[in-house]
Amino acid sequence: MESFSSKSLALQAEKKLLSKMAGRSVAHLFIDETSSEVLDELYRVSKEYTHSRPQAQRVIKDLIKVAVKVAVLHRNGSFGPSELALATRFRQKLRQGAMTALSFGEVDFTFEAAVLAGLLTECRDVLLELVEHHLTPKSHGRIRHVFDHFSDPGLLTALYGPDFTQHLGKICDGLRKLLDEGKL
């Protein structure tokens, strides 16, 4: 007997459609203004650090695609109880990473690239476990790309260095607002 599920088919079509349209207009459906400002600042940091506009665009586009797909999966109730526990763990790790990034930005001489890189790597691993059975290997590659890019100790050291002070300030302002509003 053939197993057919219109709900599964609709979810698959929605993910496919959204992956093709991962631009600014679709992102605003799932990503609020403050998050968008943080993403814009992360793009600028990536562009300045890599000296490559296409590479910076790719990493942010991958980040948006992943965020949108995970939001669609969550909104459609695709995660089971154990996966919801993983989603909670991911959110806690992401929140811990944001609070650590803020602390490093606000207190002079406390920055440690290894600590922040470790937290981002933990986030990556939990997210990969969460979406293991829901997203394609290509999406798993996007997750690795995004987290590996932003957990690069060289990029993190540059971000907390004197040349990126303005960017770091804007990122910290956005993270603080997201934490205060309970969105992170």
UniProtKB/Swiss-Prot annotation:
Domain commentary: The central region was initially thought to constitute a DED (death effector) domain. However, 3D-structure data reveal a previously uncharacterized fold that is different from the predicted fold of a DED (death effector) domain. It consists of a large, hydrophobic central cavity that is poised for cofactor binding.
Any one Pfam family match given in the protein's UniProt record, by short name: DUF758
Keyword Phosphoprotein assigned: yes
Modified sites of kind Phosphoserine: S3
GO process terms (BP): innate immune response; negative regulation of inflammatory response; negative regulation of T cell activation; regulation of apoptotic process
Protein keywords: Cytoplasm, Immunity, Innate immunity, Lysosome, Nucleus, Phosphoprotein, Ubl conjugation
The keyword Phosphoprotein belongs to this UniProt entry's keyword annotation: yes
Entries under Gene3D superfamilies matching the protein: Tumor necrosis factor alpha-induced protein 8-like (1.20.1440.160)
InterPro entries registered for this protein in UniProt: TNFAIP8-like, TNFAIP8_sf
Record note on modification: Phosphorylated by TAK1/MAP3K7; this phosphorylation triggers association with BTRC and subsequent ubiquitination and degradation. Ubiquitinated in a BTRC-depdent manner; leading to degradation mediated through the proteasome pathway.
Family: Belongs to the TNFAIP8 family. TNFAIP8L2 subfamily.
Protein name, per record: Tumor necrosis factor alpha-induced protein 8-like protein 2
Top-rank taxon: Eukaryota
Function summary: Acts as a negative regulator of innate and adaptive immunity by maintaining immune homeostasis. Plays a regulatory role in the Toll-like signaling pathway by determining the strength of LPS-induced signaling and gene expression. Inhibits TCR-mediated T-cell activation and negatively regulate T-cell function to prevent hyperresponsiveness. Also inhibits autolysosome formation via negatively modulating MTOR activation by interacting with RAC1 and promoting the disassociation of the RAC1-MTOR complex.
Compartments it resides in: Cytoplasm; Nucleus; Lysosome
Main location: cytoplasm
Gene Ontology CC entries for this record: lysosome; nucleus
Protein's gene: TNFAIP8L2
Oligomer and partners: May interact with CASP8; however, such result is unclear since could not reproduce the interaction with CASP8. Interacts with RAC1.
Cysteine-cysteine disulfides: none
Biological source species: Papio anubis (Olive baboon)
